Amino acid sequence: MPLFLYMVLLVLGIHCVQPNISEGKVTSCLSPQQNATLHKMSSINADFAFNLYRRFAVETPDQNIFFSPVSISAALAMLSFGACSSTQTQILESLGYNLTEMPMAEIQQGFQHLICSLNFPKKELELQMGNALFIEKQLKPLAKFLDDVKNLYETEVFSTDFSNVSAAQQELNSHVERQTKGKIVGLIPDLKPNTIMVLVNYICFKAQWANPFDPSKTEEGSSFLVDKTTTVQVPMMHQMEQYYHLVDTELNCTVLQMDYSKNALALFVLPNEGQMEWVEGAMSSKILKKWNRLLQKGWIDLFVPKFSMSATYDLGDILLKMGIQDAFADNADFSGLTKDNGLKLSNAAHKAVLNIGEKGTEAIPEVTFLNQPKITLLHPIIQFDRSFLLLILEKSTRSILFLGKVVDPTEA
């Protein structure tokens, strides 16, 4: 009889409960500037993000895309801890890691520092990534696995009676609801029979723009071109401010960097008309490094839609196509997790939610806007009134927290 393992990944670009972080845990986190492994991993993780994005683009053409690459990478890396032989190799290779070039211990240490760095308390930036593992109370997980996921991945582990499906479902959904402060309710509507383990991963993010938009200047009913024949009306935020930006003539797109007030930034990428597929196919860690080098600051007359976006994905088929095959098969080897036979991955779900507004993401304390003298000089206009790409990055680790495409900002 097969025993099923769920992997559920939650992503919230909104407020969530912050767990207590001890001083010892914080001070043990190495600075990313001192961690060569973490910098090496940032490129690998970015390329995984774009490869996964392209899979989503094929599976859901002409639709909004939104997900958290770093949370998926961290969850898969944690799962690889309990995998052995080809099951482990396939998971790590799908993430872009070569065990002959970077040993398992270095990979795990790198993810430990990554999670620690992301969870490091920052003033005016709320960012927290967490994991929870719900294990059937009759299952005998290995002590080393439990210690490793607790210490390296800051994972909470719960002993759960999955024989009582409704009670187990309630326990899991209640935990998720608490951790996301009620933003995700009833995440798992129906647990499969014989489920023995559920892995939940979430990342929560709230931040204020370094230069918030004045709500009084938001223009209601502005046109946004979805495709050649479809136009929708959206609230369009407007600001004249200095931003880092560039025109990439090789990729046929305009790139705008909007900083959050502390240690995070958003990249808005506007392909020239008809060039979205070209830009999507070219995105890579090298492109990000090129943009970071070439971005220049200057005055911009900026128009950005105000919108909310969410997306839910069944990652099973996509992960299979990316090379993670044994983990879903009867010959899956999770002997690093338990000596019990027959454990395999049954499902991997991912949900992401984002709110973009005048002040940043989600609710931020009120901001006072001072009257500014009218500027009579003409400045370049950048207007995001058609499909564009959106990346949100954490600065110190250069991690892609969120990656997406806005095709129709009216589809929440």
Swiss-Prot record:
<dbReference type="Pfam" id="PF00079">
    <property type="entry name" value="Serpin"/>
</dbReference>
<dbReference type="InterPro" id="IPR000215">
    <property type="entry name" value="Serpin_fam"/>
</dbReference>
<feature type="binding site">
    <location>
        <position position="395"/>
    </location>
    <ligand>
        <name>thyroxine</name>
    </ligand>
</feature>
<comment type="function">
    <text>Major thyroid hormone transport protein in serum.</text>
</comment>
<dbReference type="GO" id="GO:0004867">
    <property type="term" value="F:serine-type endopeptidase inhibitor activity"/>
</dbReference>
<dbReference type="InterPro" id="IPR023796">
    <property type="entry name" value="Serpin_dom"/>
</dbReference>
<feature type="glycosylation site" description="N-linked (GlcNAc...) asparagine">
    <location>
        <position position="98"/>
    </location>
</feature>
<feature type="glycosylation site" description="N-linked (GlcNAc...) asparagine">
    <location>
        <position position="35"/>
    </location>
</feature>
<feature type="glycosylation site" description="N-linked (GlcNAc...) asparagine">
    <location>
        <position position="164"/>
    </location>
</feature>
<comment type="similarity">
    <text>Belongs to the serpin family.</text>
</comment>
<dbReference type="InterPro" id="IPR042178">
    <property type="entry name" value="Serpin_sf_1"/>
</dbReference>
<feature type="glycosylation site" description="N-linked (GlcNAc...) asparagine">
    <location>
        <position position="20"/>
    </location>
</feature>
<dbReference type="GO" id="GO:0005615">
    <property type="term" value="C:extracellular space"/>
</dbReference>
<keyword id="KW-0732">Signal</keyword>
<keyword id="KW-0964">Secreted</keyword>
<feature type="binding site">
    <location>
        <position position="292"/>
    </location>
    <ligand>
        <name>thyroxine</name>
    </ligand>
</feature>
<feature type="glycosylation site" description="N-linked (GlcNAc...) asparagine">
    <location>
        <position position="252"/>
    </location>
</feature>
<dbReference type="InterPro" id="IPR042185">
    <property type="entry name" value="Serpin_sf_2"/>
</dbReference>
<feature type="signal peptide">
    <location>
        <begin position="1"/>
        <end position="16"/>
    </location>
</feature>
<dbReference type="InterPro" id="IPR036186">
    <property type="entry name" value="Serpin_sf"/>
</dbReference>
<dbReference type="InterPro" id="IPR023795">
    <property type="entry name" value="Serpin_CS"/>
</dbReference>
<keyword id="KW-0325">Glycoprotein</keyword>
<protein>
    <recommendedName>
        <fullName>Thyroxine-binding globulin</fullName>
    </recommendedName>
</protein>
